Amino acid sequence: MASFRRFRLLSPLKPCVTFGRMLYTRIDKDGLTMLAGHLAYVSLLSLVPLITVIFALFAAFPMFAEISIKLKAFIFANFMPATGDIIQNYLEQFVANSNRMTVVGTCGLIVTALLLIYSVDSVLNIIWRSKIQRSLVFSFAVYWMVLTLGPILVGASMVISSYLLSLHWLAHARVDSMIDEILRVFPLLISWVSFWLLYSVVPTVRVPARDALIGALVAALLFELGKKGFAMYITLFPSYQLIYGVLAVIPILFLWVYWSWCIVLLGAEITVTLGEYRAERHHAKSVITQSPEM
């Protein structure tokens, strides 16, 4: 009787256990930590070129001049915890130095920035086991569109938001408190939408929208928790500052970028595993329904 009760208690957890096993097997087989390390290395190599290209695009549009300053502050405050101010100062110096580069050097910066997008594309298609390859021209067009239209769309959305916030009817106390709550969860929403687009658009196979939304939500929540946990770790255990001194920002930045890519790839693995788990359950049900006839 006790064993029967235990079975009834554990039976609702069985799907979760099965899914967890499938997810762990997939993560282990794909070598998630190695893929994250590869992307972290490429990200650090491409970070300055990518930021240079993005803010050069903002500089080309006068309407984005003020927004680019706000966007910088928003990115470093919400996506680079603990050492955002220091990293921002260094990156702004690097970007200022890159403005004196020649045409050949500028082309090299653009190619290096595109290298990061290509690496993300390759890694995600490895996770999805996709053998379909885009043509070189189509791939370049997609990468260039992401590199150029992405920042412009973000800037346009911030321009619209700033305009709406400046309207007089929003000065009401209740509306102000509502806006504060929305702004508090805004980084989470941006992460969720960004991850959803990443998991939906980048793979060369069809990805169910529901699976991509679930995987993106898990990744966004882990990313927000990771920011707080990482900031707490740097504050409470300042071992990097004690060992490296002024240069501590380098390993701290690398560690954060690596941790971020682990979260992004975990969300991708969850998205893929959801589809595989559903297919396996469908196959098991079809076998059970066919067995009495045999």
Curated annotation (Swiss-Prot):
Domain of life: Bacteria
Subcellular location as annotated: Cell inner membrane
Keyword line: Cell inner membrane, Cell membrane, Membrane, Transmembrane, Transmembrane helix
Principal location class: membrane
Gene Ontology annotations for the cellular component aspect, listed alphabetically: plasma membrane
InterPro entries on file: UPF0761_bac, Virul_fac_BrkB
Topological type in the membrane: Multi-pass membrane protein
Residue spans crossing the bilayer: 44-64, 67-87, 108-128, 136-156, 185-205, 212-232, 246-266
NCBIfam families membership: PRK01637.1, yihY_not_rbn
Family affiliation: Belongs to the UPF0761 family.
Protein name: UPF0761 membrane protein YpsIP31758_0030
